[in-house]
Amino acid sequence: SQTDSEVAAWILDLFYSQVKDPKAAIKMLVDRIQGSYGFCILFDDRPGEVYSIRSVSPLVAAYTRSGALIASDLTALIPYTRKYFVVPEGHIVKLTGYKISLYDLEGDKVSPEMMEVNWDMDAAMKHGFPHFMLKEIHEQPEALKNTILPRMTKGLPDFTDDQIPDELFTEFNQVHMVACGTAMHAGMVARAFMEPLLRIPVTVSIASEFRYQEPLIDKKTLVIIISQSGETIDTLAALRLAKSYGSKTLAIVNVKGSTIARESDYVLYTHAGPEIAVASTKAYSVQLAALYLIGCRMALVRGKFNRNQAASFLMELLDAIPAMEAMIEHKDEEKNLVTHLIQQHDTFFIGRGLDYAFSLEGALKLKEISYIHSEAYAAGELKHGTIALITQDVPVIAIATQEHVFSKMISNVKEVKARGAFVILLTKAHAVVDDGLADIHIRIPDLDDRFTVFPIAVILQLIAYYASIGKNLDVDQPRNLAKSVTVE
């Protein structure tokens, strides 16, 4: 066989033929194999029984009026129940009709730890939207409020209810963020504003790289783990590695009771509700909001902000919410501009500083749901090679919201325009730009430079969405991709 799971089934069949006891055979199997897996097992001579076991890969189970259910993702259970339990590693689940039994590997029965999800099936419906992605784009302002407002007391960030003590933010001398994909891009944005604010090293690592390295972290390192599902396998492995070095870990996750949430020293739950579309939108925004809250609290307790400065920072963060709403309301601009985009094979995103961090996520969104080859570059690097790829009508999406490098960005835009690029320029409302510099110019409400990511994110998400629609593709389920990457 060329399939590892098929080999596991053959081994289990061999052991079961010897002992004729499902739990004993499963124990023999897991003693023999290594790696990550989540098995649901049927035995020919035991109709009406399902056995399950997992290692690293997630499994959740529930009792419902429809029967006993088990799945790899909580969303699958929500139409039937809000109460569930996470199958612990090294435990066997037996489902029979309406009954679920949980056993350890010695065969002793144990009681599962029941949990309750704080959203229901209504939150996982389209409600008149043609796609989940568009619905989730529209839900971002409310998701931000749900993440930020409960963590504000007298205008200041407060993690008392999250049981995150201020001591966590004073005992380290560096921050290391670890994540994959969109969550990693949220970390890139956070690094860009945290490092100059805190005046300590802030590093962002791709989890699939971090887990196989010997990272320079120790007991004086705060490792922030970012994952929407809380089950991303590379991120989970990175968390375990960080803990083995003695680092304190703080997880930012959206799913209560997920493996990463349970294994981290501290956890800050985002309150985005279910995100069904594979391409992340509102999860990205609330991860950013959580990171801005953390950065503000860090600055306050480390003496980089006084109370007035921290309160002002949070008010500016809240100002980003109506800015997002304005971009959602005027989404026809993005709908109209993709006509040119979808006729091209390549698209380039450029920016400087925070804008470069934004452009990374914009490029990912476009490629994952429209299948247009798209790359993001720091604008200052164009002349070091990438500008050779700029030819007539090649789309370049230039993000220019950072005041201190605005003139430099405009110079970069002129460079690509001179080589025939089709330029889509994103700036603040007050930006002064020469007529004819851009083929399309989209302005966002004026915000502090640190918070322009929120309306910019909406624009980039809508560009990707309408490009996918324009190419008649499956927006919510793009090819070859899964919502939660739980396998290596």
Predicted regions and their residues:
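Short, glycine-/Ser/Thr-/acidic-enriched flexible segments
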Residues: 44-48, 57-59, 65-68, 74-76, ...
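Extended hydrophobic-aromatic, low-complexity segments
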Residues: 186-187, 203-204, 233-236, 336-337, ...
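Generic C-terminus detector
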Residues: 107, 422, 435-437, 447-488
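Active-site phosphate/pyrophosphate-binding segments
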Residues: 31, 140-144, 148-176, 266-395, ...
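Glycine-rich phosphate-binding loops that contact phosphosugars or nucleotide phosphates
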Residues: 170-319, 399-445, 463, 471
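Conserved short alpha-helical segments that host acidic/polar catalytic motifs at enzyme active sites
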Residues: 1-126, 130-131, 142-173, 212, ...
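Conserved phosphate/anionic-ligand binding catalytic regions in large, soluble enzymes, centered on
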Residues: 47, 52-61, 129-133, 144, ...
